[in-house]
Amino acid sequence: MKKVLSSLLFLSMGLSSMGRADATTESTAAASFLLFEPSARASAMGNAYVAIADDANATYYNPAALADFNRRSVSTTFYKPVPNLASDIFSSFAAYTHPFQGIGNLGFSIIYTSLGKQFHTDAQGNSLGEFTSFGMGLGVSYGTHLFKNLSVGVTAKFIHENLSNSSNVQVGDERGKGAGTSFAGDFGLMWKPQSRLTVAAALRNVGPNMTFIDADQADPLPQNFTLGVAFVPYKNDKSSFLITTDIYKPLPDRDGGFFSFVTGWTNDTPDAEFKDIDYKIGAEWQYMLSEESAFALRAGYWHDEDGKRKVPTAGLGLKYNWATFDISYFIDNSAALRNVFRFSGGFHF
């Protein structure tokens, strides 16, 4: 049952096709809803965002970015990853950040993902009714400067995933709760050698395996590492142009457990490990409408070799005084990603 729901989730994320849902490294992980990236701005730029993260979504992408915040900010997102295949699957995210002069900045976030209706059956396949499975994560983030151009950040997470409405789930000859709880941490680094160049890295979802049936069958968290660069080659009083790129490596390893961020680099052949890497690139052109208002055009590309995805992305953004609104679109004709729009809103004060 756990594997069926995991496959469904990864289909909804577009990380693999229906026939290959169990073939990706990420599909071995529990709490894979944590891989739903919340920002429409990031999505429009191919999800290359670890070296940007200049809004409350930094609590998800890179907590080190919080160090540069000087105002309170709020970000929210709600979207349906596969509206053509399962309209009851949705993901929502909200975050709030608060600056504290001289000691660093705090952030708080929540992610809730409905995995839709599931059918509960007994060992013989007889129907026992329907239920809605879901995943939820709560995070507290902190970011501060080590030096003028170097910042670090950390996020502590509480994670819960409920895959059954029964507290007595049977898988083969074994029984379990059908729900799991765990804790994890994210770690971020951001370096700005000059005002227009940023280099950043983030290690996310570092924590122990999550148990649903018993400890021997516990599944790893979706640990991953991202290295990114953002550069502004052009900027004047009215407009600017930003380019960014990320390299993403999934690291879940059932045998590695908590230390998957170490063992996840070498638990397969070098060729397979290399194919696990995703490449993301994005660009943003922003035009200032006034001192506090702007319009943005965005485009990107996401290359996921093992998931068989090569997806162009696009989007728009509008900033008006204290509020922002962003929309993104995956330019993909596959059943999983066709007509996937993502909307985000936020404000600062």
Indicate residue ranges for each PLM-predicted region:
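Cleavable N-terminal export/targeting peptides
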Residues: 1-32
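Subset of outer-membrane beta-barrel
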Residues: 20-349
